[in-house]
Amino acid sequence: MKYAIEVNNLNKTYDGFTLKDASFKLETGTIMGIVGENGAGKSTILKGILNLINIDSGEVKIFGKDFKENEMEIKKDIAVVFDESYFHDNLKIPDIDKIMQNIYPNWNKNQFLKYTNKFKLPKDKRVKDFSRGMKMKLSIAVALSHEAKLLILDEATSGLDPVVRDEILDIFLDYIQNEDCSILIASHITSDLEKIADYITFINDGQIIFSENKDELIYNAGIVKCSEKEIDKIKNEDIVGIRKNTFGCEVMVNNREHYENMGFVVDKTNLEEIILFTVRGAK
């Protein structure tokens, strides 16, 4: 099996925050979503992968090669979109096109202009006059225009209206129709990840809680409706989290069919509820 990214035991300590032994693998030709609350460590992982911060320990391989040792070679095949624009305020779209031609040997001007037109970005305006959403669309247009094999995206769809967001998600899905291309996307918008991701990596307080196939994760999870006394019938290792209310209890389990077969009422669930129960559903 080929991997676009392999992260092994990544550690980084800041004042008041520690990323602890982060490990996961992104299979080539797939999309992985990294989800977690603000401050959970999503951006730290991405910056650690890209060698934008000095990690304390750990190893990152991209396309099977040690990233630190082969950074310049590998970077030509990576596109990165962070949640803030990195273009100078005075640049216009034609200026950016010329700059990128000198940076990327595989720069595709026609592709770039296709996306800037699709996103309705004005060619005569300077970046400083763009809205936040327009700046994000510009960054995405650049990322998709130099034949990168790996997209690394940090909150790339935040600040966009739902229609444009949906359009961009479809573009990402089209991008990975090329089986050599992969996407790692960090986002707090779980509905976006539920639509496009093949795998979900959930990080909380600097620690990866799980990294799993998204469809299997959602299919296997369910919410058992029961009384407080009936909780004793549910195996502790099957419990993701518990919510109590005036009508009884809601218990998220990771083995839905088993409890349906036991006669419990079990509701299907979604990624957002899985995250909420994992973080806030006290066992």
Locate the predicted segments by residue.
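ABC-family P-loop ATPase nucleotide-binding domains
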Residues: F82-L138
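Catalytic Walker B motif of ABC-type/P-loop ATPase nucleotide-binding domains
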Residues: L151-E155
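Helix-to-loop junction immediately C-terminal to a conserved catalytic motif
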Residues: L50
